[in-house]
A protein has these predicted regions:
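Conserved small/polar residues in nucleotide/adenosyl-binding loops
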Residues: 197-204
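Thiamine diphosphate
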Residues: 1-161, 166-167, 175-177
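Short beta-strand-to-loop junctions in surface cap/lid or active-site-entrance loops
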Residues: 184-189
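Conserved beta-strand elements of the Class I
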Residues: 25, 193-195
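Conserved active-site beta-strand-loop modules that form the wall/rim of enzyme catalytic pockets
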Residues: 156-157, 190-193, 206
Length: 208
C-alpha cells in the first residue's frame, strides 16, 4: 500500500496546478525542507517566497499577495504558525476574509525528538476559534489532493494541519468521495458510530 506524507502530496498537487496557474504562490518560513516544498521552490522560483524565520511576516505577506489576486499557501511548523503568527492569522487572513491557505506542518508530536518547543497540541483548537477560519485535517494523499484542488477554487481563509510521517492510503485515486466541509462514511454499521480524522483514520479503520 502506498505511503507518503500528506505534506508531499500538497507539494505534488500544487506543482501540477502551478504549471498553468501562475497566481499560485508558496511561502515558507525557513521550512521548505520540512514542508516538502523544495521541489516547488526549485521548479517555480518566481512563485515561491522565502521569508526566513519570521512567521508573522509569512502570514501578512500572504494576505497582501491574496489582496493582489494571488493564491498563497503559507507553510510553517504548526507549533509556530498557530502561536507566533496567531494575530496575523486572525486579523490579516480570517477577519479580512483573504484567500490564504495556512499549512501547519508536523502537527501534534510528530516532530518527536525536537521536543516540546516543536510540539503543537493547540493548533486545531486555536485556529478553530477564529471566525471565518476553516480547519482541515486530511487523512491521506488522495483526500489531501482533493482538498487542495477545492481550496484553489474556494478562495476563503483555511488552515490545514498535516503530520510529518508517511501515512497509508485510506482511499484510492478512483475512489475518494470528497465534498467540502462534509464527512465521509467509510463503513456502515448498526452498533456504534465512530468519528475520526487525520492520521488516526487508517489505524481506527483497521479496528472496525
Amino acid at each position: 500500500m502506498n505511503k507518503i506524507p500528506n505534506r508531499q502530496a500538497i507539494c505534488e498537487v500544487l506543482m501540477d496546478k502551478a504549471k498553468e496557474d501562475k497566481d499560485i504562490m508558496v511561502l515558507c518560513s525557513d521550512s521548505r525542507g520540512s514542508a516538502s516544498m523544495t521541489p516547488f521552490a526549485d521548479n517555480f522560483p518566481d512563485q515561491f517566497v522565502e521569508t526566513g524565520i519570521a512567521e508573522q511576516n509569512l502570514v501578512s505577506i500572504s494576505a497582501g499577495l491574496a489582496k493582489c489576486g494571488k493564491k498563497p499557501f503559507a507553510c510553517s511548523p504548526a507549533c509556530f504558525l498557530s502561536t507566533r503568527s496567531y494575530e496575523q492569522a486572525k486579523v490579516d487572513v480570517a477577519y479580512s476574509n483573504t484567500n490564504v491557505t495556512l499549512i501547519g506542518i508536523s502537527g501534534g508530536i510528530s516532530y518527536g525528538a525536537l521536543g516540546m518547543s516543536h510540539h503543537s497540541a493547540q493548533d486545531i483548537a486555536a485556529m478553530s476559534a477564529i471566525p471565518n477560519m476553516r480547519v482541515y485535517l486530511p487523512s491521506d494523499r488522495h483526500q489531501t489532493k482533493h482538498l487542495i484542488e477545492a481550496l484553489l477554487k474556494d478562495e476563503k481563509p483555511s488552515y490545514i494541519r498535516v503530520g510529518r510521517n508517511p501515512v497509508e492510503d485510506i482511499y484510492t485515486e478512483d475512489n475518494c468521495p470528497f465534498e467540502m466541509d462534509k464527512a465521509t462514511v467509510l463503513k456502515e454499521g448498526t452498533d456504534v458510530a465512530v468519528s475520526y480524522t487525520h492520521l488516526r483514520a487508517h489505524e481506527t479503520d483497521s479496528y472496525l
